[in-house]
Curated annotation (Swiss-Prot):
GO CC terms of this entry: cytoplasm
EC number: 3.1.1.29
Binding residues annotated for tRNA, in chain numbering: F14, Y64, N66, N112
A GO term for molecular function: tRNA binding
Gene Ontology biological-process annotations: protein quality control for misfolded or incompletely synthesized proteins; rescue of stalled ribosome
Protein's recorded name: Peptidyl-tRNA hydrolase
Organism (species): Aster yellows witches'-broom phytoplasma (strain AYWB)
Family the UniProt entry places it in: Belongs to the PTH family.
CDD domains on file: PTH
Subunit (UniProt): Monomer.
Protein's cellular compartments: Cytoplasm
Role: Hydrolyzes ribosome-free peptidyl-tRNAs (with 1 or more amino acids incorporated), which drop off the ribosome during protein synthesis, or as a result of ribosome stalling. Catalyzes the release of premature peptidyl moieties from peptidyl-tRNA molecules trapped in stalled 50S ribosomal subunits, and thus maintains levels of free tRNAs and 50S ribosomes.
Active-site residues, record numbering mapped to chain: H19
Amino acid sequence: MKLIVGLGNPGKKFLNTRHNIGFVVVDSFLSQNKYQTLKEDTNAHIYQINFNNHQTLLIKPQTYMNLSGEVVKKIINKYRIKIENILVIVDDIYLDEGKLKLKMQGGHGGHNGLRNIIDRLCTKQFKRLKIGVSLDSCMPLDQYLLTPVNASSQKNILKNIDIINKIIFNFIQDVDFNILMNGYNSKH
């Protein structure tokens, strides 16, 4: 079983913010595929997809970003998901708007959601799909990430949504992650 974690913050006031790109991606992928909503007491919206016997859970943690690791740990323990079968979708201020970067593993890069997942899982060995949201040096970081984006930025950030959905599909289908990194990191 695979686990795809879209990072974000719960609540309407965070809907169209840069920090909620993980939620947006999960919603986009689900809108194009048949899925089942699972009812569980885990502080997350949990969806299950089955492609050619490749079972996958997609989750949107409903804790705040900084506590995402709590939910991820509960899910992987309950479903016995291996660390190498986890893909976390996350915003990245160090990438230009809409730029994509796949990583096999790594640190948190200052991202508190990733930091909490690393702390709770006691490993950095999970895969990531980073989506660039850029950085505004004139605005405090928390305000920048948690303020709704304008239409132009939204379009830039999501310009590769079809490619993102293809990456997720390939991850679910067990395409070698090195091949995905080589194919997408240099082009998008």
